[in-house]
UniProtKB/Swiss-Prot annotation:
Pfam families: Glyco_hydro_32C, Glyco_hydro_32N. Residues 1-24 are cytoplasmic. Its main location: membrane. This is Bifunctional 6(G)-fructosyltransferase/2,1-fructan:2,1-fructan 1-fructosyltransferase. Involved in the synthesis of fructan of the inulin neoseries. Catalyzes a self-transfer between identical oligosaccharides of the 1-kestose series. Optimum pH is 5.68 for both catalytic activities. Stable between pH 5.0-6.3. It is found in: Vacuole membrane. It catalyses: [1-beta-D-fructofuranosyl-(2->1)-]m+1 alpha-D-glucopyranoside + [1-beta-D-fructofuranosyl-(2->1)-]n+1 alpha-D-glucopyranoside = [1-beta-D-fructofuranosyl-(2->1)-]m alpha-D-glucopyranoside + [1-beta-D-fructofuranosyl-(2->1)-]n+1 beta-D-fructofuranosyl-(2->6)-alpha-D-glucopyranoside (m > 0, n >= 0); [beta-D-fructosyl-(2->1)-]m + [beta-D-fructosyl-(2->1)-]n = [beta-D-fructosyl-(2->1)-]m-1 + [beta-D-fructosyl-(2->1)-]n+1.
Length: 612
């Protein structure tokens, strides 16, 4: 294939070196600021009157065809209306269960219930009636996130967060009316709810998302974690732990499990074990069975929290002492809220569960919308769940976990097209064609830069940052390079998934994995960002990426799942048969080889009501 001249044909992808582009950007920003100040005072809004940043006359005129195209083919989604946090995922009596936050009446947040769906294989889902809804004073504003615990063959309990009329938060109990029912259709709330209120010193709307983290078999006691914060300290995120034997009476442990200053409210807190060596290395460990591991030195514990201040899921690897109620990070510089993320994009409120069927841990996270509420109402639904991912310890780096689409996703692959040995010259693009529609696909790609080219580069972009360095349009010595998906023919619409390599004066290399949404749509009433972070690339490894494109969702995984980035894309032209895939190399100093690119068409899954 012949590479095409990116500078002459596609100036939006990058026609200038980085410094000149930044200087031009600064001039544009200054002009925009001056114009904004003139309009601000001319319109008399300096008094503090709130102004809607998206004016009605700026809303994009979406057509029914465009909106219908956005609905995904193989992601978990509601049949209609709104969803957010996953809750209580589990495997029970032959069925995978997923509960989720759901407004069954409208395509926006409010009137939150627990939606409920079941599956035999984690990819085809049947939606059941709502499990529980807001029908008591303690949950009248919503039945919010929580968890499910299978206590015994005769008892399955649900712990959920309730919101009062004034949005005070409490922890509440419901139980499966018939534990012998594999579908768990009916739930009964406890007569004496709430079972927990925020303890002294905790604000009444900063207390939520109960989740079991350990079972002390010798004392028949469950340890339940609840997320919170303490603003009397330093805007500190904290994890509180309660002990219970019967889920009706709870005792708060006197010390917090862990806390981190200046990160704000912790939501959806989890602690779970990962094997670091030994026979369980490639399998998961159940929280309730971790004490059966003979050599505890082969196990680490992940602490994860969803940061309410910024809506990202952070995690860290460390040591868990359940008796002393203490979790300690291996590395304080990458503690929870300041270090590692599961995903740098639109992925939040994640929950994991142990799958006894395949001895694995699976993580769910919800993917919200970034368009206007008006558009969501018009299309009749909003938000979805990310692809279920397996979670394993990364034995090669020893510093992170790997999250990767579950193996069942490969069963959706259909026709495949292979490309190999494509040289992508500096400042060029290469269209990948002849594989059918490009909006419901699975891509695996590997790139290399010659060792000689890397060694010849003295220093390159040591201060690079995905979110603030200009995205795929800004050219550097060793990047960006990667793929453009959901692209139209002239590349005025595309989402770029790419690597960017920085080199220090000492010869050290840092690889950034980024996803640029800024040209994903010509619509102007959606949020478009550049997301991403650094990712370990070890000696001898290629730059490897997997991208799952499912209409308006793009989930990308770098280096076998060491990091990932999820984006919502709402193209106006690059839809249906107009969607394209390109390779690109916007580096100024090196050519890049696409050693291997494999693209599969993906089948759709069943996602509809259960037929009784």
């Amino acid at each position: 294939m012949d590479a095409q001249d990116i500078e002459s044909r596609h100036p939006l992808i990058g026609a200038r070196p980085r410094r000149r582009a930044l200087r031009s950007l600064s001039i544009l920003l200054a002009a925009a600021l001056l114009l904004g100040l003139v309009l601000f005072y001319a319109n008399g809004t300096g008094s503090g009157t709130a102004v809607d940043p998206v004016r009605v006359d700026n809303e994009f005129p979406w057509t029914n065809d465009m909106l219908a195209w956005q609905r995904c083919g193989f992601h978990f989604r509601t049949v209609r209306n709104y969803m957010n946090d996953p809750s209580g995922p589990m495997y029970y009596k032959g069925w995978y269960h997923l509960f989720y936050q759901h407004n069954k009446d409208f395509a926006y947040w409010g009137n939150i219930t627990w939606g409920h769906a079941v599956s035999r294989d984690l990819i085809n889902w049947q939606h059941l009636p709502v499990a529980v809804g807001p029908d008591h004073w303690y949950d009248i504003s919503g039945v919010w996130t929580g968890s499910i615990i299978v206590v015994s063959e005769d008892r399955v309990v649900m712990l959920f967060t309730g919101g009062t009329k004034s949005f005070d938060q409490s922890i509440n109990l419901a139980e499966a009316a018939d534990p012998s029912d594999p579908l768990l259709l009916k739930w009964i709330k406890y007569d004496n709810n709430p079972i927990l209120w925020p303890p002294p010193g905790i604000v009444r709307d900063d207390f939520r998302d109960p989740n079991p983290i350990w079972y002390n078999a010798s004392e028949s006691t469950y340890h339940i974690v609840v997320g919170s914060k303490n603003d009397s300290l330093q805007h500190t995120g904290i994890a509180l732990v309660y002990l219970t034997k019967d889920f009706k009476k709870f005792d708060l442990l006197p010390t917090v499990l862990h806390s981190v200053d200046k990160v704000g409210m912790w939501e959806c807190v989890e602690v779970y074990p990962v094997a670091t060596t030994g026979p369980l290395l490639h399998k998961a460990i159940d929280n309730f069975d971790v004490d059966r591991v003979l050599d505890r030195s082969t196990v680490k514990h992940v602490l994860k929290a969803s940061m309410n201040d910024e809506w990202h899921d952070y995690y860290a690897i460390g040591t868990f002492d359940p008796i002393g109620n203490k979790w300690t990070p291996d590395d304080e510089t990458v503690d929870v809220g300041i270090g590692l993320r599961y995903d740098w994009g639109k992925f939040y409120a994640s929950r994991t569960f142990f799958d006894p069927l395949k001895q694995r841990r699976i993580i769910w996270g919800y993917i919200g919308e970034v368009d206007s509420q008006k558009a969501d109402i018009a299309k009749g639904w909003a938000s979805l769940q990310g692809i279920p991912r397996s979670v394993l310890y990364d034995v090669k780096t020893g510093t992170n976990v790997l999250t990767w689409p579950i193996e069942e996703m490969e069963g959706l692959r259909m026709a495949r097209k292979d490309f190999s040995g494509i040289k992508i010259k500096k400042g060029s693009t290469v269209e990948l064609s002849d594989f059918g529609d490009a909006f419901q696909i699975d891509i695996e790609a590997e790139f290399t830069i010659s060792k000689e080219a890397l060694e010849a580069t003295i220093e390159a972009d040591v201060g690079y940052n995905c979110s603030s360095s200009g995205g795929a349009a800004i050219r550097g010595t060793l990047g960006p390079f990667g793929l453009l998906v959901l692209a139209n023919q002239d590349l005025t619409e595309n989402t770029a998934t790419y690597f960017y390599v920085s080199k220090g004066i000492d010869g050290s290399l840092i690889t950034h994995f980024c996803q640029d949404e800024t040209r994903s749509s010509k619509a102007n009433d959606i949020v478009k960002r550049v997301v991403g972070g650094t990712v370990p690339v070890l000696d001898g490894e290629t730059f490897a990426v997997r991208i799952l494109v499912d209409h308006s969702v793009i989930e990308s995984f770098a280096m076998g799942g060491r990091t990932s980035a999820t984006s919502r894309a709402y193209p106006t032209e690059a839809i249906n048969s107009a969607a394209r895939v390109f390779l690109f190399n916007n580096a100024t100093g090196v050519d890049v080889i696409a050693e291997s690119v494999k693209i599969w068409q993906m089948n759709s899954t069943y996602n509809d009501f259960y037929h009784f």
